[in-house]
Structures are given as structure tokens and as C-alpha cells.
Amino acid sequence: MNIIADEIKLKQDVVTYRVCEKLKEFTLDSSAVLYYNFPLYRGELPEDLIQAQLLLASPQYGILYFKCLESNRYLTKEEEIYLDDLDVSIINRLNKRSELRKGRRELKFNVTLLIISEKDEIIDDRKYVSLPCLKKAIEANKDAALTDEEFNILLSCIDGTSRLTTKKERKISLDNESKLKADVLNRIQNKEAAFDLEQKKVALVTIDGPQRIRGLAGSGKTIILTMKAALYHMAHPNEDILYTYYTKSLFGLIKNLIERFYRDFADNREPNWKKIHILHGWGGVELGGVYSTACMENGIEPITYNIARQFSSNPFDYVCKSILGTGKIAPKYDLTLIDEGQDFPDHFYQLCYALSKEKRIVWAYDDFQNIFDINLQDEKNTFGKDQKGDYLVDFSKNNNPLQDIVLHTCYRNPRTALIAAFSLGLGIYNSKVLQRLEDNNHWELLGFKVESGHSDVGDQMVISRPIEHTPNIMNQELGIYTIKVSSFSDYASECKFVTQCITQDIQDEKLRPDDICVICLDNRNINAYYSLLSRMLIRNGISTFNLVDAPNANKHFFYENNVTLSTINKAKGNEAGMVYIIGADTVFINRDNVILRNKLFTAITRTKGWVTITGGEKIKYCLEELNKLEENDFKLVFTQPSKETTKTVESGSKVQQNLLLDVQSKIDILVNSGLSVEDIMQFIQRKK
């Protein structure tokens, strides 16, 4: 039996904790789930909350929910009405799924209320049960066992994940074994979505204090944060929630998920958006942000980007540090949720902390978003110290197991695509390994299995990805060959090939245009690439949504019936069924550059299905590395390098990055003086 609860709060609830401990003594199914203070539903008024004290879901014993009385008494009239409403809410949700019914109305399992008391009696069909007789009462609820699929559907109804999957309308064949891309994506999206145990523990429970959620791209971090926002708003409709994020195009997804989850629990009512503040990190005139809003509400003059970059190579960190230095920040938010935490500087965390009333702050963090930044985030340094010199956040001082959760399963990427992304990102099959993880534990935190080696320098390492860390449906439907690589002599040939592939995807494979995303890794020629590609596609009747040309305040990544053309930065946090990565030869011109490798890693991990990588002659090195990966049965086999050899690469990349920032600053000054970008490029060409 698995327990979903804040154990600290549960232990403080003495009566309920005693019942929970008694249930642990029984031999229930290993897949059974016991929820504490969940599920919860909205009553007639926003202030009315209907909540189960304890609810047990089991494939053998059905559903039992408990009212734990603190003394030898009967239910009050108000409690009877409350429990009747809860009963109706639970049964109505379950009855919506035909898979859980036998006939038109009757469920395949029993839904039973047990009132835990010192008595053993039935009054008005209400069963009062003492702890010594609890096992017998549970046994009486036993019925024909549910199948794994049926129980999965039952849990999705309880958890609120039944609305999780976005259903896209695609033309489908009648052949259930069809391998058309549209049919494969349909079968994957129609598979019942349900939280795994790790996700349940963090999504359905909000602890009183800081909490970090770690996991790879596609492990469900955004889904968990949006569920937290919806449930907290259900329970505390008059309190303010901050949800902040880094990638502007995530706004639409975040708002949509919060609304879907809230409507599911609140009988299709809309959340009060005046209490849920979805704000970009920085913000500006056209886009609300945490920094810009904090300045406005606290009477502080905001610092513009152009001014901030004159004082720091990290302008956003500079403005956050500056506003904190004013000492004027007034706490506003009762719950703060930070998405894409790996992209934010420390002073932004400290600003969010200052804006949080009860320091109830939750952040999602991708340990591997930056290939060359493999050190785990230190929460103590991230949030800093108070005036006494004590760390504001220190996980070592709190024994709550929910304060730092790691999600091991990746739900977005096919297994081999994720392994390929790691292989290319780390340079495992490059002429030399470019980056290393410090120890075996770090590999395991990322959901891998260390088959050989201890991560000591010179060790022969063999790393695999357990098949159970990818949903079975994806393994079954997609197989192992999800990545293709093609080389071309010029841009025109490359764009023509990609146009033909996209046209075939839409016409023959029956994909929607908005199932497809193109990511260009050649920043220097991205405008030329997308201009040519757009013209070629429109000749075939295919429209594009070019994010390079989108206004700065754009909040969307997809536009219906358009193929998305994106930069790597704007693609972060988003996903697509079919991903084309063009201009990828630029990554292999300097094969040891980990910053460029990081871009390729991020691009590959946008896919829910297939990836096609294209580029010039140097793309052959990408193909060579992928062939070696396949020869090793999609395992990472390498000799553990020393810290010094990998640090050399890291330092070189950072030097290059700082030089590029300096060049960018000088270009901006020239543009502001009246020169055009074309004038500057012509000058550079003459100097070659």
C-alpha cells in the first residue's frame, strides 16, 4: 500500500494517523493507494470545500473512504450532509467512465464509507467501525479484482489526471496496428494518463515550506506545478498564488493546464484568475513579470535591460539584486511556484522568497538542462542567508521527505531518443568524452542504471536506461528507430528535403501541421533558413508560425494548423510529435564545444515521437556517434574522464560565451548609433 500524504501533518492529526497505522498492518494489494486529505471538491460556494479525510483505492477492495471520529460519538447532522456530498462527488466522477461500470449505472466495485469510532454498529446505513474490526469491514468491500487498465482509470479519476492529455483531432485509420505517425500519436495520447507514485506524492500534497522538484525534461514538472496551483486555489480561494516561468511561450500551456485541473475538481467552474498570477520572470511593458510587477507594486523604478547589461554580464540577476537592495519588497503571495528553475539566477529565487508570505515556495528544477553545469543546485546558496547569517533554506534541517523529490520517469521522449540526447550531449562517443557526472548516484537520480563502474577516473562505465523509466505504450509504439540523420551540400538542398519530409508527414502520415516543430541550431543563418523553408512549404499549401519574427510579448509556441519554426531558446519547455533539427552541423564544426552540445540535447528532448537531424558535411560526426551508440545496444559505454580534462572544455566554452556577450553588447551600441545589422555584417565580411 502506498501512502500519499505530508507525513508531518498526518502525524499531527493523531486520530487519523492511528487509523493509517492500523491500515499498514493489513496485507493489502501492493498497488493500493491511501490518500490523506484528498480528493477535494468544490461545493456550491467558493468557500465550500468537500474533502476526504482518508481514502483507500484498491483493485481488490474498491474504494473506501473514512471519517475518523475523535471520541465515542455519532455523526452530527452537518457531518452527515458533508459526507453525503462527498459520496456523490466521488461516485459521479467514477460513473463518467464507462470502463468502470457494469451496465449503465452500477460500478464494478464498491464505494463505501467507514466511520471510525469505538462502536461497531450500523445506523441509517452508516457503518461505524472500531479499529479491532477494521480489517473485517475492509474485507467485506472486496469484489472482483479490477484489471490494471481499469485500476489505472480509477486512479486517474481520483487524482484528476483524466483531463491531462490534450486530444488532437487527426485523421486515423481503422487499423489498430497502423504505424502511420498520426495513428501512433493518437494511441499514445489516448492512453490513460495517471500520475506515478513519485508524481502523486508531490503533485497532490503541498507542504508548509520550501520544496524542490527535480527531474529531466518530460518528467512532468510543469504538470505537477499546475496541479498544485489548481488544488491550492480550490482549498484557499482567497489566497494569492504566483506561478512564474522562464520561456515566454509556456504561458498558454500553463494557464490551460491550471484551468483544466481546476474545472475537473470544481464541477467545471472557472478559477478566479485575479488570485492566480501567471507571470514571466522579468516582464515588461507588454508582458507581466515578477520583477516588473514587484517594482510597480512597491513603488520602485524598474531598471531596463539596456541599462542593466552595462553593469553585469547577467542583467536579470543584477536587477533582482538591485530591487532586493531597496529593502522595500512587501510579501504578497501565499504560494509561489517557479517553473524552469534551472534557468533563473540566485537573486531571482531570493526575490520570490521575499515576495512569499509563509515561505511556501516550490520550484521545478532540471538537473540536466545545461550539459556543462552538472553540479546539483545547492539550495542554501541559492536562497542566501538572513540577517543573522543563517541559511534561509536548508534541507538538512528538515526531515520532511517531500521537501526534495526526484522524478525518475520521462513521459515525453522515446527511450532511445533520450539516450541519444545524453550520448551526444555528453560526447560519449566523441573522440573524447566531453562531460562527466560526478558519481553513480547522479546517474541514478536521472533515471539511469549503472551496470559497470564506480565513476572513478579510469573506470570502464556502462550506463543503461531501464525500460520501465519510459511508459510502455511509447516503447511498444515507437520501437528503437526514432532518429534519422541526413547530410546536404547547401541550404537549398537541406530545406528542400525538410519540406518534402514535412509534406509527407502531413499528406501521407496524416500528422497535423501543429504536430511538427522545426528547430534551427545555426543562429548565424537562421533567418535565411526559415525564409527559404517558409516559401517552400507555402508552395505546398503548408503555413508556418515563425517564432523568430514573433513579437517580444508572444505567449504561444503553436498556432493551429501551422508548422512551428523556433529557436532553441524558445523551444525550451515545449514539445512536439515530430521534430526537425536543421543546421545541426554547426554543433560539430567545433565538436568539443559543450554549449553547442547542450543545444542539441535540448532540441532532441523536445520530441514526443520522432527526430530528423539535418545539416552540412560535418553532420557526419553526429551520425558516427549515433551509430556507435546503436552498436552498443543503446548503452553509454566509456572510460570515466578526469575532472581536469572535462573542466578544460567547460572553461573554454565559458570564455567563448563571455566574448560573444561582449560582441553582442558592441553590436547593440552600433545599432543604437544608427548603423544597420547589414552594415555591420558587410564590415565583418570585408575584415575576413
Predicted regions and their residues:
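Pre-Walker A segment
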Residues: 131-217, 226-236
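Extended, charge-rich low-complexity interaction segments
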Residues: 141-154, 300-327, 575-590, 644-650
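Short, solvent-exposed polar/charged micro-motifs at secondary-structure junctions
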Residues: 42-47, 120-126, 285-293, 415-416, ...
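Accessory nucleic-acid engagement/destabilization modules that flank
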Residues: 1-174
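Conserved helicase motor core of SF1/SF2 NTP-dependent helicases
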Residues: 192, 212-242, 246-273, 281-285, ...
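Conserved helicase NTPase motor core
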Residues: 179-214, 278-281, 285-286, 290-382, ...
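Generic hydrophobic alpha-helical segments
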Residues: 19, 23, 199-202, 229, ...
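Conserved P-loop NTPase-based nucleic-acid remodeling module centered on helicase motor cores
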Residues: 46, 58-95, 106-108, 122-132, ...
